[in-house]
Amino acid sequence: SIPESVETSVIPSTVVDDYGTKKFLLTLNDGLETESVILPIEGYKKKRHTLCVSSQVGCAMGCDFCQTAQMGLLRNLTTAEIIAQWHAANHALGTKIDNIVFMGMGEPLENLDAVIPAIEILADNNGPAIASSRICVSTVGRIEGIKLLAAMARTDGYKRLSLAFSINAPNDEIRKKIMPLAKAVSMKQLRNAILAYPRHDVGGVLAEYVLIPGVNDSDEHAVEICEYLKPIGCGLNIIPYNPRDNSPWPAPTETSVNRFVAVAKNTGQFVRRRITLGRDAMAACGQLGNTEH
């Protein structure tokens, strides 16, 4: 059950791009809006759907490459407003959701008072019944939040809860230029926190790297980030940059993305390149929070 009442309206199929990616808008009871995205993923035997949920209206982290950051933080979402996103996708839009990723608007670890109960509800066999192994929480690197989420991931029923961390740079110098949080939290401190996160046989931890032309996309950067990740032993997810409004950078070329991935793989690092979905609809990674709907 949803723990508190919530009045939301869903504008179904706000955006549907060529791949079937759906970005939808929730209007909250105070008039603010939050966005969520349904991503169709071709599985081994069938198509699955991942729901990218928001945890805040806006975000305070200020990452230069992210559309949501340009809004600033307006407020945290409640647990009910997080669950309402699943309800809207599953019922109003009629899409069976297989996976949940907390990678929408906001920094989830800045709102754990709502996010942790939301995870409990999503994983409840009497509710959505989404296994914890199919739930992933992403962070830019909030150390205290990682510790709290790690405690949850050590408890029965949540031991396969996954953590993704947005590293986005091969070293502190570059990271500080594009992610203000990096001025307070070094990559070494972040790695130490990640190393303490409980792991399981199918992973549990994933590094995310937004590839930005001329910023973090050289061959040397590829080698450097893989060296940094060696002690962690996690996968590296390469995300081609999706330009925000008034972006100072273009999207990377296919050639540059493929080259970076190849160089990284050559070090022995397990690498995946995220397929870009929803860019034209401003529904891709880093593009939520645009002012025109």
What are the roles of these predicted feature ranges?
Residues 1, 266, 278-293:
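Radical SAM enzyme core and accessory elements
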Residues 1-49:
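Flexible, acidic/Gly-rich N-terminal and inter-domain linker regions that tether
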Residues 11-15, 136, 276:
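Short, solvent-exposed loop/turn elements at beta->coil junctions and helix N-caps
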Residues 17-25, 146-147, 216-217, 248, ...:
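Short, solvent-exposed polar/charged micro-motifs at secondary-structure junctions
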Residues 42-81:
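Canonical Radical SAM [4Fe-4S] cluster-binding loop centered on the CxxxCxxC motif
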Residues 70-99:
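Conserved alpha-helical substructure of the radical SAM core
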Residues 90-99, 104-267:
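Conserved AdoMet/S-adenosylmethionine-binding subsite of the radical SAM
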Residues 238, 273-275:
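A structural preference for short, hydrophobic beta-strand core positions in alpha/beta folds
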